[in-house]
């Protein structure tokens, strides 16, 4: 079951009021119970704030979570999963952390945290890091950060964390993802060609952190453009002819 804290966004995005969302919950949980469901899932929309109503505090979040948990308890089912749907990108790492800690303290049976946080203000990869540190296991991302929300007032600027950036972060933290980062970067380049404009990822432009044989040559010339920066994948030909920063090339060997 799902409820938006922001009634204004519920009306704009779902064409339903918050009250209508709540009123539909009883039928949903009853149908799940009749079908033999053994565990329930809840989704909290606009958890951290709204472009139309301002910020929402922790108590407001917990009140709405309690309402949904109780709906499941009314039919004898515990909740083991919660999803945060932050289409307007109000998340920040400290609010994610305080919310997850409060939920774990109050409802320890909720074990799975799903994060659908838009990257409107550029803080979402930090929010995802905070969630990773607390054991969240489900994260929504997109190639190059593509996405947006026409109902929140930010359009395409309300995109997502770029998949390639998040996978790079996970790999740096020693978390196996099953993704080939090099292929993700190539896919992000293809996506840019398809949509016809640059996307919002960083690792697809600067490359992963170079190690071992991939470290840059010390006599590399100036690298200015994004095209030239793609040498990590396309080789040194992309920056041939650029100026050298070394006035005395013997300094390279000193």
Q: Where are the regions that the model predicts?
A:
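Catalytic cores and adjacent flexible loops of soluble metabolic enzymes
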Residues: 1-254
């Amino acid at each position: 079951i799902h409820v938006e804290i922001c009634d204004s966004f519920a009306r704009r995005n779902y064409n339903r009021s918050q009250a209508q969302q709540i009123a539909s919950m009883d039928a949903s949980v009853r149908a799940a119970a009749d079908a033999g469901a053994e565990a329930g899932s809840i989704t909290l929309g606009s958890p951290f704030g709204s472009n139309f109503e301002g910020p929402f505090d922790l108590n407001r979040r917990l009140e709405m979570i309690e309402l949904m948990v109780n709906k499941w308890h009314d039919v004898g089912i515990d909740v083991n999963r919660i999803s945060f749907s932050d289409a307007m990108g109000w998340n920040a790492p400290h609010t994610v952390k305080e919310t997850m800690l409060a939920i774990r303290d109050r409802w320890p049976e909720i074990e799975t945290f799903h994060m659908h946080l838009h990257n409107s203000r550029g803080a979402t990869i930090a929010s995802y890091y905070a969630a990773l540190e607390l054991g969240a296991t489900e994260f929504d991302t997109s190639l190059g950060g593509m996405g947006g929300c026409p109902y929140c007032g930010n359009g395409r600027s309300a995109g997502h964390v770029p998949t390639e950036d998040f996978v790079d972060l996970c790999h740096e933290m020693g978390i196996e993802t099953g993704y080939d980062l090099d292929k993700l970067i190539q896919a992000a380049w293809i996506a840019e060609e398809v949509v016809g404009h640059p996307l919002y990822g960083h690792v697809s432009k600067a490359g992963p952190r170079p190690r071992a044989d991939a470290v840059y040559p010390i006599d590399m010339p100036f690298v200015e453009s994004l095209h030239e920066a793609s040498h990590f994948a396309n080789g040194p030909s992309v920056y041939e002819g650029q100026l050298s920063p070394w006035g005395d090339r013997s300094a390279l060997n000193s």
